[in-house]
Amino acid sequence: MQYSIEINKNTEIFDIDKVAKQAAGAVLMRQGKSIVLATVAREEKQVEEDFLPLTVQYIEKAYAAGKIPGGYVKRETKPSDAETLTARIIDRSLRPLFPKGYAYPTQIVVMVLSADPKVDLQVMSLNAASVALYLSDIPMKAPVCGVRIGKIDGNFILNPNNEELQNSTLDLYVAGVKDELLMIEMRALPDQKENEIFIEAPYADVLTQTTSQNMNELSEDEILEALNLAQKAILNGSNAYEEAFSKHKKNSQIELKNEIEHPEILAFIENNFQKQIKEAINQMAKSERASELNKIAKEILNLEITKDWSEESVLNTLAKVKRKLIREQILNEGKRADGRSLNEVRPISIETNILPNAHGSCLFTRGQTQALVVATLGGENDAQMIDLLTEKNPISERFMVNYNFPGFSVGEASPIKAPGRRELGHGNLAKRALYPSVDENYPYIIRLVSEILESNGSSSMATVCGGSLALKAAGVPSLKLVAGVAMGLIFEDNKHAVLTDIMGLEDHDGDMDFKVAGSKDGVTALQMDIKLGGIDQETLKQALYQAKEGRIHILNIMEEAAKEIIVNEEVLPKLELFSVDPSKIVDIIGQAGKTIKEIIEKFGVSIDLDREKGEVKIAGSQNEQIKAAKDYIINITSSQKGTKKGSKDKDISGFELGQEFQGIVKKIAPFGAFVELKNGVDGLLHSSKSKHLNLSENQSLKVKISEIKNGKISVDLCE
C-alpha cells in the first residue's frame, strides 16, 4: 500500500506491507530520487537489566549513488563516521519515546538504497525510521518528525535541500513529536562568499590573502525564532504521519516490566540512613561519593533485620533515595550537591603550551573535568579525505577534532579501544563549535586532539574551551575565542530548575543535557537531548539565556589566559605560498614526478601544487630550506619554455569592462568555471558567484566582464 504525503515543502511517498514483511515494522520511503528502507525488529524475550536495549544502524549502500566501494574489499564494511553520526541522531530522537518498562532488545536499521544529491538523507532517514517504529507493535504515542532549518540572506528556510544548505549560514536539525522538542543539533556556518585570494602580479612571489569571513553566530532570540518555525513544522509532520498510518499500526501485546517497589526497604533507608546519604552527596568528590554509597549499602545488608533483602533491591532503592534527595535539594533549596548555586560555574584553571614539542596545547580544568587539547598543523597531504555518498570525488577535511575518553578519566580500569559513537559525537560537536572561528583561508591543515584526563560532566564543552585556546597557542589566527557550557534541567510536579555547568551526578539524575557553545556575540553550536519526552519553549529560553551568562563568564577567564600565551615559533611548521604560470606546473613535476621528488628529497620539504591556478605551497621545518626550494622552483619555471605544445597567449586587446557575451562553459574547476567569450578567449566565473547554479560543460551563460588584470579576464553573471 502506498501513501503520498505533501509535508513541510517535501513530497514523501511511503510503501508499507511491500518489503521486509517479517520485521516488526518496515517502510520504503521515497523523496525525489532518494529511496530508504527503514525496518524495526525486536526479540521476544526481555532483558533482566534496567536499561533500554535499543540499537540503531544507518547504512549507505554504495550502489545508491552508482559507486563501487573503494579499497581492497569491494563491499560495505564498518560504518563511516558520517553514518555513525546519523545513526546517533536517529537514536537520540527516538529513544525518549520508548515507554518506561520496555526491555525487549530492539534494532532499527535504515538503509539508503538510492541517493539523490539534492535530498537531505538525515531528515529523510529519521522520518522513515519514525514511521516504521510507529507501524510496529511497540507502543508509541505518536510518530516523531525531524526537520532542518537553514538561514539564507537573513531569512529562515524550512527543510533546505543540499544545494540551498551550501548558501546557508545556519544548520539547525530538530526532532520532536507533536508540540514537544526531543532533540536539537545546531551549528553556525561561516559566510565564505567574500573570501578570495588575489594574485597581485603575474605569477607573483606571494599570494595576498584577504578575508571578510563572518562567523554568523546566532543570538538566543534568533535560535528561539528558528526553533519556533521548526516546532510548527514538527507538529504538522507528526500529525500527518499519525493521520496516514494510525489505522495500519499493529496492535501492541507487549508486556512492560513493572517497576518493583520495596516500600519496607525504602522506609528503612529513609528513616535510618538519609543523613549519611545526604552527607555522601554533598561533601564528597565523585569517586569518594560512589565509594561511600557502596559502604552504606554494605552496612545495610550486614544488619540482622535486612538478612532477607537482596543486594540488588537494596542498591536500586538506595539509588532512588539518592536521586530524590539530589532533586529535592535543587528544587526546594536552590542548592546543588557540590554547594554551588543553580547558575554557578565550577572553578576553572588554564595552562597553555605545556607540551614543548607540540605545536599548541592547553590543559583546561573545570571542577573535576579536565581536558588536554593539542593542536597540530600540517600540509595539504595531511588532510582527511572523506568519501561521501552524494559526492563524485572524496572531499578534503582541513579541520579535524578527535576526542578520546580513556577509562582512567572516570577511575575505571578499561582497555583503550577505537573511538565509539560517544567519542565521535563529542568530537563532532566540538568541531562544529570551533569551525566558524577558524579562517577559511588559513593555509595549514589543523588537527585538534582532546585527551580527557578527568571527567565529571561537560567534557565535550571542556574540549571546546581547551580547543579554542590550543588554536591560539599554535598561532592559528582564529576570529574569536569560543567557549562551551553544559546545561541541565530538573523537573518535578510543575516545578523546574535550570542548572549551569552540570556535573556527572546532575547529568545522570537530571532530565536534560543541553550543551551550548559560542563566542561573546552568539552561539556557534548547540546540542540538546531530553529525557522527559519533550520541553517547552519557555524553559528552553531560560536555559539559553542562563547558558549565555555562563559562557561569557568562561570567556572572560579564557581571554585573560590568552593574553599570557607565548607561541613556540621554533616548533611550528613554515609555509611559503606563491604562484607560477600554470603551464609551468608540469615542469615542476617532471617526467613521472622525477623533478618534484628530487626537490622534496634535496630540501626536506613537502610541496603541494594546484595545476589550475598555478599555486605552489612549500612546507617545512626550516625557513632556509623552504626559501632554497622556492628559488630552485622559480629557476626551473623561468628557464623552461613550457611543455604544453601549441599553447600561446590569446589577444585580449578588444575586450573592455562591462562588455556582455553569451558565452559557453568550456571547463569547470574547483574555484570556478571558464566561459568562452569569443575567438577562443575565456573569462573566469568565480565559484562564489555561481554557487546557486548547477553548471555543466557546454552550457550557455550570459556574462559580463568585471575585471581585466594581468592578461586575465574575470566575469560576472548578467542579472
UniProtKB/Swiss-Prot annotation:
Mg(2+) binds at residues 507, 513. One of its GO terms (molecular function) is polyribonucleotide nucleotidyltransferase activity. GO terms for cellular component: cytosol. It is found in: Cytoplasm. Residues 658-719 form the S1 motif domain. It comes from the Bacteria. The keyword Phosphoprotein does not apply. The keyword Cytoplasm applies. Residues 573-633 form the KH domain. Pfam families: KH_1, PNPase, RNase_PH, RNase_PH_C, S1. It catalyses: RNA(n+1) + phosphate = RNA(n) + a ribonucleoside 5'-diphosphate. Its cofactor is Mg(2+). Its EC number is 2.7.7.8. InterPro entries: ExoRNase_PH_dom1 (IPR001247), ExoRNase_PH_dom2 (IPR015847), ExoRNase_PH_dom2_sf (IPR036345), KH_dom (IPR004087), KH_dom_type_1 (IPR004088), KH_dom_type_1_sf (IPR036612), NA-bd_OB-fold (IPR012340), PNPase (IPR012162). SMART domains: KH (SM00322), S1 (SM00316). Keywords: Cytoplasm, Magnesium, Metal-binding, Nucleotidyltransferase, RNA-binding, Transferase. GO terms for biological process: mRNA catabolic process; RNA processing. Involved in mRNA degradation. Catalyzes the phosphorolysis of single-stranded polyribonucleotides processively in the 3'- to 5'-direction. NCBIfam families: PRK11824.1. Belongs to the polyribonucleotide nucleotidyltransferase family. PANTHER family: POLYRIBONUCLEOTIDE NUCLEOTIDYLTRANSFERASE, POLYRIBONUCLEOTIDE NUCLEOTIDYLTRANSFERASE 1, MITOCHONDRIAL. This is Polyribonucleotide nucleotidyltransferase. The gene is pnp.
